[in-house]
Amino acid sequence: MALLFARSLRLCRWGAKRLGVASTEAQRGVSFKLEEKTAHSSLALFRDDTGVKYGLVGLEPTKVALNVERFREWAVVLADTAVTSGRHYWEVTVKRSQQFRIGVADVDMSRDSCIGVDDRSWVFTYAQRKWYTMLANEKAPVEGIGQPEKVGLLLEYEAQKLSLVDVSQVSVVHTLQTDFRGPVVPAFALWDGELLTHSGLEVPEGL
């Protein structure tokens, strides 16, 4: 019990270091990189920690630094900056992956879980050429987007919403109603290929 409490305390401290950073600029959204300390051993970061690649074998767990922030069971990585307020927009190049999840998660979500499996993460998932929403391991289909080269995510913290955006049409495809109770971070999972993030963007006009 004491060990579990200590782990939770360390995770909270890790998250607290990043609180408030995302809302310092009124016009631009959260600017982030991927946090290597959270990345599962099957994942490798690239392009100055803005992209992530999946490796079937990955690194030997013994060669990866042990820390409480790292995901141990699932190929997940979190961003390094938390959101506690405001409207934020970022994009993800998805053309090189056929199976992935993108969204947001509580900064202290369990590192033994996967985004979309628990009830403290909210994601859009792409698998078998179809899109779904995913929360607490429950999936619902999302229609009308196909597989574009790039998609956008619009986070509206106070409104408790996360939307998938069609970048080419600058329009919302689907909106997830969320239940934020504290700081959240952009979150990513993949099982093939690579994802590339683009953050620090203005919310497009009309969204």
UniProtKB/Swiss-Prot annotation:
N6-acetyllysine: residues carrying this PTM: K53, K130
Coiled-coil parts of chain: none
Keywords assigned: Acetylation
SUPFAM superfamilies the record matches: Concanavalin A-like lectins/glucanases (SSF49899)
GO (cellular component) term, any one: nucleus
SMART domains, sorted: SPRY
Residues the record lists as N6-succinyllysine modifications: K139
Protein name according to UniProt: SPRY domain-containing protein 4
